[in-house]
Regions:
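Well-ordered mid-protein domain cores that form the structural environment of catalytic cofactors
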Residues: 105-128, 135-146, 151, 163-184
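Glycine-rich, flexible loop motifs
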Residues: 2-46, 71, 76-132, 223, ...
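Mid-sequence acidic-hydrophobic segments that form the walls
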Residues: 79, 95, 99-103, 118-129, ...
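Hydrophobic alpha-helical context, especially transmembrane and signal-peptide helices
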Residues: 44-48, 126-129, 146, 167, ...
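C-terminal auxiliary extensions adjacent to catalytic cores
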Residues: 2-21, 25-32, 36-39, 69, ...
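Cysteine-centered functional microenvironments
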Residues: 131-136, 326, 330
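FAD-binding core of FAD-dependent oxidoreductases
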Residues: 50-64, 68-72, 79-102, 132-154, ...
Length: 504
């Protein structure tokens, strides 16, 4: 059980989103939310406040009569439930609901506590509104996608429950849950913010961390297979560059390589008198083997930056207007604008694309016998010409990497004015997060094929017993899923199984 106040750590977000930890609201935070609601209730009676007694967006110039104020809140929910495309994965919906709840935990939205309690109920019971992927321009927040969450909260639309897509009203009646009622601005408060892009962003972040970890391990195993000199990962060399990510990757590689009998010591091998005029072993390996700290270092930095920004976003008030009980006022502005998340998702997808490109190049090294000089073509353990080894899986890896490269074009600078130019510059943050999600999924596919290629190479060279304990554990884990193969068999199911292993 996670007790939620107005701040979440990355560990808490992961526990709630990935491990389905239950949620309860901290009592002090509960009191603050109730106090904020009562302040707004009194403050708003004789004032013009956007979205309470005015229309929305460019329609804000029209005042709404008192008898229609409740109807207004339902109208924004129903009118904006217009998404299209496939539904978001339920893990992303769970993360989005948590992000919306956290905005209300800041006690600056003026919502009735019932709104927060119902979001908690949905999270704890695993009720996930059906949210189509497309609809957000990310700049009055995720209006369309969040409207689908609000639609479920008022007992309409559809939800996923126990793996089934069902009518919301039926599920709520079955569980004895009352639909949300509108009090002052609940409709606007639920729909107006960055929760969906932030939720998808966190799911992307967790997977990006895993991919970086797998890439680092695979890179050590790559260098063991190639019997590389180990000085490229030395503390002295990497310490001469001040980038935190580069040094973190180099340190991780040194730890993973500890105990290896395959890596060479340059001083022992080359820094002694030699009469050779031509060297059989490469003095310096290819960049995809030697420059790993410099390539994965920026990926590490991008992941760290995304984590910092996403934590700031989920622990912020991204509503509009903002209710300020302390100063006895209501402030109008643009905290719903998703530029921070949009920019980070663009950076993260570029970083994961580069990681994927590194993976594909490392795999190419293993497949290309004239480059590696130690393995048969395509790591083919069968009869050359009759059997094909990893030749065909490489097509999948190459085409998928190419798609990542195209998807890496930034959304952040693709603003299109809309909403009758009321929203004349927008973030496209949810689109950026969705594209990042696609890149992450692609990267797992390439990584899975690379992992199978790596263990085939280890078996070809018969070096499993000479690997470092960490890379031997990786070898054993992949071999438990994909046994050594010589003859040609369909590999799509094994690739899928390795992907699932990598994700966990």
């Amino acid at each position: 059980m996670a007790t939620v106040n107005n701040r979440l750590s990355i560990e808490q977000v992961r526990a709630i989103v990935e491990h389905n930890d239950r949620v309860e609201i901290d009592e002090a935070t509960r009191r603050s939310i109730i106090e904020c609601f009562h302040f707004l209730e009194a403050f708003s009676k004789d004032k013009v406040i956007y979205g309470i007694n005015t229309g929305f967006g460019p329609m804000a110039q029209w005042r709404i009569d008192d008898e229609h104020l409740n109807e207004l809140q339902y109208n924004i929910i129903r009118s904006h439930s217009t998404g299209a495309g496939e539904p978001l994965p339920t893990i992303c919906v769970r993360a989005a609901m948590l992000a919306r709840l956290m905005t209300f935990m800041q006690a600056h939205s003026g919502v009735n506590i019932a709104t927060c309690e119902l979001l908690v109920e949905f999270l704890n019971r695993g009720i996930y509104p059906v949210i189509p992927q497309h609809g957000s321009v990310g700049a009055s927040g995720d209006l369309v996608q969040l409207a689908h969450i609000a639609l479920a909260l008022i007992g309409e639309g559809e939800v996923f429950y126990n793996g089934e897509r069902r009518n919301t009203a039926e599920v709520m009646q079955e569980l004895g849950i009352e639909p949300l009622k509108m009090f002052i601005r609940e409709g606007l408060a639920v729909t107006n913010g960055t929760a969906v892009m932030t939720g998808i962003g966190f799911v992307n972040l967790f997977h990006a961390k895993r991919l970086l970890d797998w890439s680092t391990k695979a890179s050590v195993l790559m260098n063991e297979i190639a019997s590389s000199y180990d000085d490229f990962m030395s503390e002295t060399l990497n310490g001469l560059k001040l980038h935190k990510g580069q040094n973190a990757i180099a340190e991780a590689m040194r730890e993973l390589a500890s105990g290896s009998k395959m890596l060479l010591n340059r001083e022992a091998e080359l820094y002694r008198r030699s009469e050779e005029s031509t060297f059989e072993h490469k003095v310096q390996p290819y960049y995809s083997l030697r420059c790993i700290p410099q390539i994965l270092g920026p990926v590490w930095d991008a992941v760290a930056s995304a984590e910092s920004v996403l934590l700031n976003e989920i622990n912020s008030a991204d509503d509009n207007p903002i209710v300020d009980p302390k100063n006895q006022t209501v402030i109008h502005g643009g905290n719903f604008h998703g530029d921070y998340v949009s920019y980070e998702m663009d950076k993260l997808k570029i970083a994961i694309t580069k990681l994927t490109m590194l993976t594909e190049r490392q795999m190419n090294y293993l497949l290309h016998d004239r480059i590696n000089g130690i393995l048969p073509p395509f790591v083919n353990l069968g009869v050359l010409g009759l059997n094909y080894g990893m030749q065909a899986p490489a097509f999948t890896a190459t085409s998928t990497t190419a798609e990542c490269q195209t998807l890496s074009n930034p959304m952040y600078v693709h603003s299109i004015p809309n909403n009758n130019d009321n929203q004349d510059i927008v973030s496209m943050g949810t689109n950026s997060a969705l594209l990042c999600q696609r890149v992450v999924e692609n990267s797992y596919q390439v990584m899975a094929i690379h992992m199978i290629t790596l263990v085939q190479a280890v078996d070809c060279l018969k070096i499993a017993d000479r690997l470092a304990p960490a890379t031997r554990a990786l070898y054993d884990a992949i071999r438990a899923i994909v046994p050594t193969f010589v003859v040609d068999t369909p590999k799509y199911k094994e690739i899928a199984a390795v992907i699932e292993f990598l994700k966990k």
